[in-house]
From Swiss-Prot:
Keywords: Phosphoprotein. GO terms for biological process: phospholipid transport. Signal peptide: none annotated. Belongs to the slowmo family. Transmembrane segments: none annotated. One of its GO terms (molecular function) is phosphatidic acid transfer activity. InterPro entries: PRELI/MSF1_dom, Slowmo/Ups. This is PRELI domain containing protein 3B. The modification Phosphoserine is found at S46, S51. The keyword NAD does not apply.
Length: 194
């Protein structure tokens, strides 16, 4: 078993970061995620948003890894459960693979919270537990997978910034459009009065 942990601070408020987290895929930084399906989404009586999603991924595994695990197929599926608490301002996301579970399990947990000293920033705490089962060189593969998770976490942070930039651009565009539509009737009314 290998445990990987990381902490990152986003220079954006919690509301922005959690909105981006829900819209993170697809993105050009991590093309291995090829599909996201929402299986269930509901708000519980206390106001928490619960989501259950299925992520489809396509991994380009090195040939040595394919030969060790005895699989040519690289499409895998991950189930993801998240809970967003808008009152406490926390988002907890847990994911686990549902493919190749007889050989490997990757259990990941992410927590997004406002930064305690600066509410305009958000802290992401991330942990992954990797267990390779019944395969020779198991600890080597766990280390390799931890390295891949670390690399993908960096890509994930870049993707979050990309989504946040995209969301901000959409907001600016909508704001400009709304301003234009307000000015047009006012200008027309001013023209009619003359």
């Amino acid at each position: 078993m290998k445990i990987w942990t990381s902490e990152h601070v986003f220079d954006h408020p919690w509301e922005t970061v959690t909105t981006a987290a829900m819209q993170k895929y697809p993105n050009p930084m991590n093309p291995s995620v090829v599909g996201v399906d929402v299986l269930d989404r509901h708000i519980d009586p206390s106001g928490k948003l619960h989501s259950h999603r299925l992520l489809s991924t396509e991994w380009g595994l090195p040939s040595i890894v394919k030969s060790i695990i005895g699989a040519a197929r690289t499409k895998t599926y991950v189930q993801e459960h998240s809970v967003v608490d808008p009152v406490e301002k926390t988002m907890e996301l847990k994911s686990t693979n549902i493919s190749f579970t007889n050989m490997v399990s990757v259990d990941e947990r992410l927590i997004y919270k406002p930064h305690p000293q600066d509410p305009e920033k958000t802290i992401l705490t991330q942990e992954a537990i990797i267990t390779v089962k019944g395969v020779s060189l198991g600890s080597y593969l766990e280390g390799l997978m931890a390295s891949t998770i670390s690399s993908n976490a960096n890509k994930g942070r870049e993707a979050m910034e990309w989504v946040i930039h995209k969301l901000n651009a959409e907001i600016e565009e909508l704001t400009a459009s709304a301003r234009g539509s307000i000015r047009t009737p006012m200008a027309a009314a001013a023209f009619v009065e003359k």
